[in-house]
């Protein structure tokens, strides 16, 4: 999302799952925008590190603001549209999403140590999401 499209403000310009993951990872990291990694660490069975992704982060907004958003998103999981995420037994901040015509559903949520994002689409007759 580059902000050059005026429809972005209105919510009409689609975000990729990567965009959403980056934004929520920044919230989970108290306003520090981290470098995203599909695999952060690989260890042997005895705990020897084989790979550690390089880490870096850029402070993009104040930690207090990120914490306020996290508190609101925790309410979504506790009392809102994402209550099934409570089954993990952990405090989770997150948001569910659906399309108006019920052809897509998504959830993105985080704890202080993990973020998960899922998006599913029901394809049309041509196989397009």
Regions found by a protein language model. Give the residues of each.
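Primarily short, surface-exposed interaction patches in extracytoplasmic proteins
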Residues: 1-19
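A penicillin-recognizing enzyme superfamily signal
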Residues: 14-129
């Amino acid at each position: 999302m580059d902000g050059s499209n005026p429809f972005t403000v209105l919510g009409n310009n689609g975000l990729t799952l990567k965009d959403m993951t980056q934004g929520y990872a920044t919230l989970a990291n108290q306003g520090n925008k981290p470098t995203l990694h599909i695999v952060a660490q690989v260890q042997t069975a005895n705990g020897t590190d084989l790979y550690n992704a390089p880490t870096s982060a850029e402070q993009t907004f104040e930690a207090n603001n990120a914490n306020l958003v996290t508190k609101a998103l925790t309410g979504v999981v506790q009392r809102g549209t994402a209550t099934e995420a409570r089954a993990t037994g952990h405090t989770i901040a997150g948001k569910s999403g659906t399309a108006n015509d019920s052809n897509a559903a998504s959830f993105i949520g985080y704890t202080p140590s993990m973020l998960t994002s899922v998006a599913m689409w029901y394809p049309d007759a041509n196989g397009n999401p």
